[in-house]
Structure formats: structure tokens, C-alpha cells
């Protein structure tokens, strides 16, 4: 493992409408089978819908707040010590926490059946911005799991 080459971060892909790296990443998370233009339409429609009820001037404010609220601060990773596997709580890298938050928001939007994707994504973004919804519940579950396994924190590596 140690002899492998260093992996560098990719250059961020910004979206054309808002020139935002955050929205660009969200579009990539929504995209399936390489259909970027469809993913862009879904995300832009969701941002417009999520921003309708707010008095915010900046349309990205709602989505930024939603991702901030869904970001996990700690997570657990399995660590094998002497025949036993422990769930060890670790702090999450900022890039990973942002990625997890977006993944959770998109996945829970996809799981809402009977609703078009742009509406489901808009609802999930609105709820996450208000500290509610499935993605925030998932973050709380991850935090509870880390809290419950705090005794194994000394196994950090």
C-alpha cells in the first residue's frame, strides 16, 4: 500500500449556470449513465423549487445550508483488533463529509417513490436546510453510532 503513487485531487468541475463547484458536484452525484444534461436540468429545477418558498436572494444559500446541515462530523470505521472487530469513531475529512452529505441527500431523494426526481430533490434540500428530513436523520444516526462506540476511540490509527 505505501509504495503506491500519491493520489491527487481532481480539478473541480464547476456548473455553467451558477459557476459553483458545489452544484457541479451535486450534478455529478445526480447523474446516471453519463447523462449530464439531464442531471443538470434536474438539479437546476430542484434549486429553483427549493428557493421558491424562501426570501433568500442567493439561490445557492439554501443548498449550501442543506449540505452543511447534513454533513457528518464523526463516523465509525471497522477495525479488527485481536480477533474482535470494533467500530472505531473517527473525525471525517471535510471533503468526505461534504461528499457523504450530498450522497445522502440524492439517495433519499431517489428513494421517494411516485414523485419526479426534481421535486423529490427539492423537498430533500428544503428539509435538510431546515434540519429535518432523511439525510439529517442519517447524519444523526451516524453521530449516535460514534457516540455509542466512544470507548473504542483509543483504537484510532
From Swiss-Prot:
Source species, domain of life: Bacteria
UniProt keyword list: Ribonucleoprotein, Ribosomal protein, RNA-binding, rRNA-binding, tRNA-binding
CDD domains according to UniProt: uS7_Bacteria (cd14869)
Record carries keyword tRNA-binding: yes
Classification via PROSITE patterns: RIBOSOMAL_S7 (PS00052)
InterPro entries registered for this protein in UniProt: Ribosomal_uS7, Ribosomal_uS7_bac/org-type, Ribosomal_uS7_CS, Ribosomal_uS7_dom, Ribosomal_uS7_dom_sf
Family from the record: Belongs to the universal ribosomal protein uS7 family.
Name of this protein: Small ribosomal subunit protein uS7
Amino acid at each position: 500500500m505505501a509504495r503506491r503513487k500519491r493520489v491527487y485531487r481532481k480539478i473541480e468541475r464547476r456548473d455553467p449556470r451558477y459557476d459553483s463547484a458545489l452544484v457541479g458536484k451535486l450534478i455529478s452525484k445526480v447523474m446516471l449513465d453519463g447523462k449530464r444534461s439531464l442531471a443538470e436540468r434536474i438539479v437546476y429545477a430542484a434549486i429553483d423549487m427549493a428557493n421558491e418558498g424562501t426570501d433568500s436572494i442567493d439561490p445557492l444559500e439554501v443548498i449550501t445550508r442543506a449540505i452543511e446541515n447534513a454533513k457528518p462530523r464523526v463516523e465509525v470505521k471497522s477495525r479488527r483488533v485481536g480477533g474482535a472487530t470494533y467500530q472505531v469513531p473517527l473525525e471525517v475529512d471535510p471533503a468526505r463529509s461534504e461528499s457523504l452529505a450530498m450522497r445522502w441527500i440524492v439517495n433519499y431523494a431517489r428513494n421517494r417513490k411516485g414523485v419526479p426526481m426534481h421535486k423529490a430533490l427539492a423537498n430533500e434540500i428544503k428539509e435538510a436546510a431546515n434540519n429535518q428530513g432523511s439525510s439529517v436523520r442519517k447524519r444523526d444516526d451516524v453521530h449516535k453510532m460514534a457516540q455509542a462506540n466512544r470507548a473504542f476511540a483509543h483504537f484510532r490509527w
